[in-house]
Each structure stands twice: as C-alpha cells, then as structure tokens.
Amino acid sequence: MMLSLRRFSMYVLRSLRLHFKKIIITLLTIQLLFITIFVLGGRSSIIDGNWKSFMALFFKPLAYTNRNNNHASFDLRSKDNVAKLYEKMNFDTSGKWIDTYTLKNNLLTVKMGPEKGQVLDSVDELRYYDNDPRLVWSVLLDHLLESDSNEYAFSWYDWANFDSTNKLIALRHTNISCQFVCEGAFDKNVLEMVESEVQEPLFVTNRNKYDESLWYNRVRKVVDSNSVQQAIHDHCMNNDAYSNGTPFELPFIISEISERLRPEVYDLQAKNHLLYSNFTPLSLTVLDSDKDAYRINLKTTDSSKSNIVQTNLLQNYIKRHRNEMVNGDLIFNHTSMFEKFLHHGSTKKRKLDVEALDKTIYAGEYLELSPSDFQFNAKERIIELETRLRSEGLPSHDTHYLRSLKTSVNTSPALQQKYFAEASDITDATADGHHRDRRFFSIGHNLLNDPQEFEARLNSLIRNFQKFVKANGLISWLSHGTLYGYLYDGLKFPWDVDHDLQMPIKHLHYLSQYFNQSLILEDPREGNGRFLLDVGSAITVGVHGNGENNIDARFIDIDSGIYIDITGLSVSSDAAKQYMSKFVEEESSGESFSALIEDYKFDENDYFDEVDGREGLAKYTIHELMEWVNSHPDDFTDAEKNLVTKTYKKELAISRSDYAEKDLSPKQRYLVNEKYNLYNCRNQHFSSLNIISPLRNTMFSGVSAFVPNRPIATLNNEYKVPAKYGLLSFQGKVYLPEFRYWFSFADMKKFANLQLKEPKITRLESPLNDLKFSDISLLITNILKCGFHSVFASLFNSFDSTVYRLKELEIQYDPSLSEEEKSSLLKTLRRGMSKKIKSPEKDPIIYIYERKLWENVEKLLNASNIYNIASQVEKEKGKEFVERSQQVYERNFDGFRLPDGGNSKTVNDLNSKGLNLFGDNKKTSNNIFGSDQKY
C-alpha cells in the first residue's frame, strides 16, 4: 500500500527535525570532547591509549543522582542497581515500582521504531503509548477530582495490554495487511521486516520457533490460501484511518476472531478485536484494599477513540500540574493521587454500599448460612425492578440485570445457548485456550514459558476476587480444586490453571445486579490487576439442562484471559444421584432414603413451576418440550433439536438408573432437595447445608477467604483425599511437608541428585519421606546451583502463607485441644498474623516491567557479572529462608508470637500450640485428613 501524501509529508518533517537535533548533539559532543581533553590532560586521553576510560565519561548512564533538577532514569549499568533490580524482581511482592514514571523519560521518549530514542515535544505528537498504570491512574483520578461528573469515557487502550499492537502502529515503512494476521502462523519474512523496523521482537513467547526451519515449514504447510482469503473476507478489513496517518489506529480491523490460529496470531487478533469492538464495561469498580469499593460510571463511547490523549484528559492533566514540572519533566505519582482521591469530599458519593449486603461478615471466625440464602424468586425481583423502572428509572446495572432476568426466565434450560466463549480453537495445546476467555486471550510477555509470570496472574486473580467480595460483603467460598489445594499449604495446586468458587444463589444475584459487566480495578497501592466481572445469561436456571452453561459467572483477567469460575448453589430439581442417599440419611439420623420418601406425600396435581414467572416453551417439562419439538420440527434449528434431545435423554437415563431418585418426578426431586437442604450448581455438584455452613474464615494466597464447614467431606464427594499429611506425589509433582511445597519430580531428581547424574550437586542422603532439618539447607543450595531460580523465588515468597496454613492445621487437628481452645487459638492466629502475610507472588504487571528491565541488563553486562550479582542476592535470601525455617522447626518462630486481641501489650506465643507437623510429620498418627474436625 502506498503511503498517503499526508503521511509522507509528516514523515519528512519528522526526519528533518530529527536530523537537525542530531547535528546539534554532534556539535555539542565535539565541544565537550575538547573541553574534557583540556581539563584531564594526559590522565585520560586518546593518546595514552586509555580509550575505554575516556569514553566512559560520555556514555555513563544516568543514575539516581539528580543533577540540574532533572528526573533521572534507572541506571542499568550500576551493579548496586542491578542487584536491587534482581532482588525486587524475584523477592519483593509488594505493589511498589522500582522507579518513577515521568513525562519525558517515559511517555515522550519514543521506545521503538525509526524514531527510537527521540523525545517528542508534546503529547499531541504521540501516535501510541504504553498504558503504564502510573500514567493512566494519575490522569483518571485527577479528572475525577476536578470534575463534578462521575462519568468517564472508557477505552480498552488505557486498561488492557496493547504492547504488540503498538509495535504495528510504530511502523513507518513496513506495510501490514490483513493477510499477516489471518494466516495460522506468521509469515516469517514479514515478521522479520516488522521486527527490524521496530527494533524489538513482535512477541517473546516461542519466538525462537520461527527460526527453526523444520518447525516453521510444518506450521506454514497447513496454511491454506483459500481459507485465509475467506477469513480475510469474513473477519478483516483494511483501516483507512491508519492509511491517513491518524494516531492510535491499527492497519486493519478484526470484526471477529478467526479459528485455528497459533497463540501469537490469536493474541494479535484478540487485541485488535477488543479495541474496535462495541463491547465496553458498564462501570469501573475501584477497590480500597479489601475495605471499600467505589463506582465510576462509564460513558457510551467508541473505545477506539476514547483514550486519555484522544479525550484530552492527559493534556488537561499536564496543564493542571504544570507548576510541578522540573525542566519540562513531570512525575506521575499515582499512589499519591489515589490517597488524595480516597480522602476527597467528592469521593463519598462514589462509595458502594449495597443495602442488602453486610461488609462486616469477614470480621468473625464463622458465618452461618440459612436455607433462604439458597433460594431466589425471579418473578418477584422482575416485578420490583419493573415498578422502579416506571416510577423513577433504573441505573445501567439494574437495567442490564432486569434484561438478563427476563431472558433467563423465558428460555428453557434445554434451549439455553452457551454464554461463555473460550479460546479453545488455538492450534497450540500448551496455550490452554480452553481455560482462557476468547476476548482477552494473550500470550503476555512470556506467559506460556515463564512460570513466575503465569503464577503471578493466577495469584492476582484470586487475591483480588477475595478483596472484592470482602469489600462489598458478598459471600463466596473456595471449592473444587482450589479448596483441595488450600488443604495442604493455603495455596492453589501448581497444576491448576484457574480457580473455582461457589456462592449461594442469593449472593450470585447480588453479584449480577450490582457488578455484572464492571471492570474491577485493584487498589493501585497494592497492585495493578484489572478484571471483568461477567455473569452469564442463565442466572435463574438451577438445573443442568443441556450442559452448555455450567458456569454462572467469571472473574476474568483482561491481560491474559485467565479466569475464576463462579457457580451459584440453589435448590433445584436436578437429581443428586449417587450422593442423594448419603445426604438424606445423614440429615435424618440414619433413616433410609426409601423410608423417608415413602412417608413423604406428593400431590402431582398441584401446579409446579421451578422458576416462577416463566412463559412459553420455558414452562414446559423436558418431556413436553421434546413432544413439541417433534410436532413442530420447522420451528427449530438442527442445533436446537440436538440440545433438546440431549437434555431429554439425560432425564430418561435417571428413570432407568439405580439411583435412589429414579422413580421421582422433577417436582418430587425439587421438594426432597428443599426439605433436606440439598443444593447444587448447574454442573451437578451437590452439597448439604451442614457441610457448607457455618463457613470458616481463613487465609488463602495471603488474603481472607471462606471455606466450607467440612472441607474433607466436601472434597470426598468429588475426589479421594489421602488421610495422611506428609510426602505425597501426584501428576508428576511431589509435596514435601518440610517445605510446604509441591515440587516437579523431574526437577527434584536433579536438585536432590536422586539418580546420581549431577556430579556437581551434593546427593540427598535422607529418603524423601524422612528428611532431616539439615536436608533443607542442602536442598536450597542445590536448587540454586541447578538454576531453578523461579522455584526458589516461589518458595521464598510463599513462606508466610504456607506457615500460616501449617499452624492452622496444627491447631485444627490437635485432638488434645477442645473446640473452644481451637476456636480461640485460630482467632488469635488470624487476627494477629493475617495483615502481615505478604503476597506469595508478584503483581504480574510489575513483574513484566522488571523482567523487561532485566532483559536489558542481560544485553548490557556480561554473563559472568550477572551471575555473580544474582548469586549473591540468592545466597542471602537462601540464608534467610533456612533461618526462618529453623525457627519454625524449633517452634521458635517470631511470626507466631502475636498480640492479644484485647491487649496489644500481651503476647500470645502460638509456637507450642497444636500438633508438630513440621518437626514430626512422619508419625503414622498424622492421618489428619481422615475426617473433618470440629473447631
């Protein structure tokens, strides 16, 4: 495509200005050269041959020293700074940034492309920018404080990650067409032209594969030209605004994400589609840690034309803060601005307080639930909202919720279409596309290959969801694999790629009414998480139906597409199947299920509607619906017929099974479930009220969380939990209780030298199931020698979380303690230690930022210097880890000396309380997971 005359003119003018600046800089450098020679005489002259020391005078980077009142950048050649960066990148999980973000050093300095290194004169010259949270938060908060309005023009460009698309905007000479992003894998020639011009790789994850000829030929061989042309025709068009030189525009517009793409291609399509789609959140929900939340309403605007430059918010910010400039530069201090926002008078009107919710529920040790929490009257809620709509109007969230309710009640469970869309059609299975939201799929910086980056994402997800529900008084608890992982060390299993939580149906509806389609923003003092709360369209349906909508809601990380699955539990007519007899007999003091049913009177003539207010086909039983479909075949698509048939066959299978409920109708099943407090999600996971309630207050990933009253019973309904707490192996992982950590067995064979194949690694002499304390120090040394840096970082950073869970287990399962003693000790532990637990993983955005800085260090310093610096940092951290572990082993850990709740001067020492699961975990009596304990 030929450059337009306007673009060409702009390019010529910029080039002339750039060359003019270079001439001036060259003249100044020559002048400085002669001055230096004159001043230094023979000490550092070219004539003496000391060229390196002489040139160092000119090329020494800026350090933190602040000369002439300039805001200095971070010096990556300073060994002290490199050590500081390595320590911060691996062992500091706080929300603090390693440097400051400024107007000149960051925003106006061109980072890539032909003009790399040039400092622009004004933000009006920006064609793209990195949406660093410090920049966006500062501008947004300043706008809200200066404006009477609580509205804000939203753009995905300011909140999601557009690093790769910015590289396409930065291009001046290389023309990119739809074909580049519609082929299953990138054309290497075009890819290299792009990277040559921007002077950076377009992506990092598996970029090296494109340089392997066998791999490249294989993935390109499957590219079918006809399919590509069809994909271009159906899903992609060239962007005239880009051709005309309009800033922030991409060369093409994706109308729909294609199928069968490699992750890096899918990533680029998904980002493009997100930017140009009509889909935007209804609001922003800003967290004040886990204490409060604030609502910012969003204007209905074109996301691709509403970023902080296009709407002049950035320009206005600079004008208002011009008096803070130093030599034309300006610091964006977002945390200071956030503090100002929290304490400003106008912020009170933005505070979220849902009348039906109680924000104090997380203050106690227990939370009692009632049967009413698991029931919901859709018809009543619809009437209430429609009455308000007619009399006073409804806020956008209520309007959206009302629409969802009506859609749900009037759609048969057998005809519900799948709501959530995953990136399941990605051609690389390692991308876990089936566990990623299609709209937000991203390969991140190196998400598929860097375990620290991946675990940081999952950790940020669960921590922020828990802070979100606590700040608003919403009830949820850990479930499925997430609960199972918590059981051992207070963390997720390392093989899990998402999280699972459950809610009572009443609170699922609060979640939907007040927060559906809100972008949840983490407290910027603690991190930089951005998550879309998305509730599905089947929120009044409690039965499995056609199985297409087992998940009620998702909490989605918009920078990766990784999510939390949220399911609501309610009374329904689903069959509990193999669990029914067990649940009912437990609730009924041992009476058999058949005897109970025999005495229970059902009147099948009474009208029964599981969801009150349904109309049309939604009112039909599955038998009636199947009959209707068969008699009106032209009214249904083949897909709809298949869904109804599938649902019908499932119902028939129950009547032909040996389940206790095989002779019960849906109405009878509903009444039995209601009578005996049996609740289920749409994925047919059943539980009873006394297994769930009272919920227990605990810590998970370093933040408050609820778990069911009887976690072992809950898990044994789904898994088979080994009774013993000790050495375990599963899916190639090994749990070592001395470390409270799941190691890869392949890694362990190396750092324990189990097969004597590592001559430089001291062999572990003790068997894995009988480690001595001295083995801990040896294994830490070996882990570092073997280069398992991310493993050690994870061990170090999760120490607080895992020792908290260790002490919790020791108290909960000590048979010598009474229920009252356990309750008192657990209360002391939680209230005294919870606020001191650091996050077990880094904030992912800060980690990626520091990771990129470190990659620059690797280009600047030789490998030997880097190794020495990193080794010294890790040696000190390894020593600290062993010392803290020894304190726990000797039951002398400072962290377990906690203040008394009523008297801050009185110290409760919990070291000696409870079992000794660390120093004595080999006992056969440590079968603590054989059953639930009362506490």
Curated annotation (Swiss-Prot):
Entry GO terms, CC: Golgi membrane
Topology Cytoplasmic: residue spans: 1-21
Main location: Golgi
Keywords: Golgi apparatus, Membrane, Signal-anchor, Transmembrane, Transmembrane helix
Loss of function: phenotype: Eliminates N-glycan mannosylphosphorylation, when its paralog MNN4 is also deleted.
Keyword Calcium in annotation: no
Location(s), subcellular: Golgi apparatus membrane
GO biological process: one example: protein glycosylation
Membrane topology value: Single-pass type II membrane protein
Record field: transmembrane: 22-42
Sequence motif: DXD, positions: 498-500
Biotechnology usage: Mannosylphosphorylated glycans are found only in fungi, including yeast, and the elimination of mannosylphosphates from glycans is a prerequisite for yeast glycoengineering to produce human-compatible glycoproteins.
Pfam families recorded: LicD
Lumenal side: 43-935
Induction of expression: Expression is repressed by RIM101.
Top-level lineage group: Eukaryota
Function field: Plays a role in N-glycan mannosylphosphorylation and has partially redundant function with MNN4.
Family label: Belongs to the MNN4 family.
UniProt free text on domains: The conserved DXD motif is essential for the function, which could be an indication that MNN14 has transferase activity.
Protein name (database record): Mannosyltransferase regulator 14
Species in which this protein is naturally found: Saccharomyces cerevisiae (strain ATCC 204508 / S288c) (Baker's yeast)
